[in-house]
Amino acid sequence: MDGTYNKNAYKCPPLTRANVHGWEILLPCDVSFIWEGGNTVPKVIKGGKKTYTTPQGQEYERDILMPSVIGTMSFTIGWAINTPPGFSVWMSAPPNSPVPGLYPMTAMVPGWWPDEVNMNYICTTPNKIVTMSEGEPFMYFQIADDSFLEEVEFDVVN
């Protein structure tokens, strides 16, 4: 939206609301990777791991990028997102922020899910290096009330 002429996209309340109706997770470092196409797993070129230091001075490494399955790259966040019963976490790429060469895999994670979550992207362009910068959002999530689905009724008129 910042890239639109005179930032005109901000004048559209539905667009603005979509962009602020949840939380973004930002990359802790620059990353780049490539998918060579076909039945191959993407290869990390830069930023696969990041070293952190605890307040006590201990260093540890954490994965940032993990090649997943054929043509899929996982961005790790390092933690689980648990919600109260009846709520789930809807997660996807940040709205209105496409990344050339990638397609986000949107997920709905139930509140009881015990494992850490990853943001997965399908690589769409073989032999194209995908680069994302430190501080760039790679995941967007919001809390969803599961109960409304039981009450929704559609009235479709042709």
Walk through the language-model features, giving the residues of each.
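DUTPase catalytic domain/fold
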Residues: 1-158
